[in-house]
Amino acid sequence: MTLPSRRFLLAGAGALAGCSILPKGNPPPQLFRLTVAPPASASGPALKGQLLVDTPFAPSALDTDRIALTRSATSFDYFGGVAWSDRAPLMVQSLLIESLELSGRTPAVARESLALRADWALKTDLLHFEARYGAPGAGAEASPEVRISFSAKLVRMADRIVIGQHMANAVQRASRNEVPAIVDAFDEANHQIIQEIIAWVVATGSSATR
């Protein structure tokens, strides 16, 4: 169903069966999740040692399972009736860890919450994770652009020094102004971001150990 141009609101829930006196409620949201980034070429150096991946820091507007959208630089909203399968930072952390494992270039990777002894820690800030409406010249029903933005830091745990910092940005236009197509655009943009971060982590860590 094409999304309305104004804020997305749930339609009223259907009547309860029979003569129940329970109040009517909204149906649970439809859940969506993103997929693991396909591994790029495994050629080149691998990161030596254990890598811990911290939960990305995110502003409160993004630290939620709601799927975010913007219509201007100063507005923030969410799609109605749908949600991510987990809070966005936790979902991204899980995808980043799985993608690192599948890459073949980071043989030892885990969540930082496990408090394992490690050689490296990856700290990230989730700066943008939203669908953007209102591009110049776009009509009210035009499909949005998905924007994902990360700031990443690689910490050498032996001396707790940040050995590198990287900004990763991806923009992907949805093929249609419908939630499944918008989620597909999130998926593609997230793949680009994760593959870029993996390549940067391996290159930065490998250079620091030479």
Residue positions per predicted region:
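Envelope-exposed proteins and targeting segments
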Residues: 47-49, 63-65, 72, 80, ...
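Surface-exposed short loop/turn segments
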Residues: 22-41, 103-159
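N-terminal export signals
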Residues: 3, 7-21
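Short secondary-structure boundary motifs at beta->alpha junctions and helix caps
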Residues: 77-83, 158-199
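Sec-exported extracytoplasmic/periplasmic mature domains
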Residues: 97, 101-105, 198-202, 206
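A structural "domain/chain start" motif
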Residues: 20-90, 204-210
